[in-house]
């Protein structure tokens, strides 16, 4: 007869790697066209002027300039790039 009871296997023990989301370029930081400004799930931030949105809701600069965060209607948070001559040089 066995003196040890068979141990049950745990269903835990897995964890996925973090997705590296968040703001990559902060307010008044200089950006060049194509720079990623925010990586997000859903639209926590909406694209303003000179900012595009990818299919995974990533916001990126369409022009060279300086990043600006502001609120719009319905308390939505927007990210814009204010184009400036020689901003990111």
Curated annotation (Swiss-Prot):
Gene Ontology molecular function, alphabetical: structural constituent of ribosome
Q: For the region Disordered, what residue ranges are annotated?
A: 1-21
GO cellular component: a single term: ribosome
Report the record's Gene Ontology biological process terms.
Answer: translation
Looking up InterPro entries in the UniProt record yields: Ribosomal_bL27, Ribosomal_bL27_CS
Q: Which UniProt keywords apply?
A: Ribonucleoprotein, Ribosomal protein
Superkingdom of the organism of origin: Bacteria
Does Ribosomal protein show up as a keyword for this record? yes
Q: Which family does it belong to?
A: Belongs to the bacterial ribosomal protein bL27 family.
Name of the molecule in the record: Large ribosomal subunit protein bL27
**Organism this protein belongs to:** Erythrobacter litoralis (strain HTCC2594)
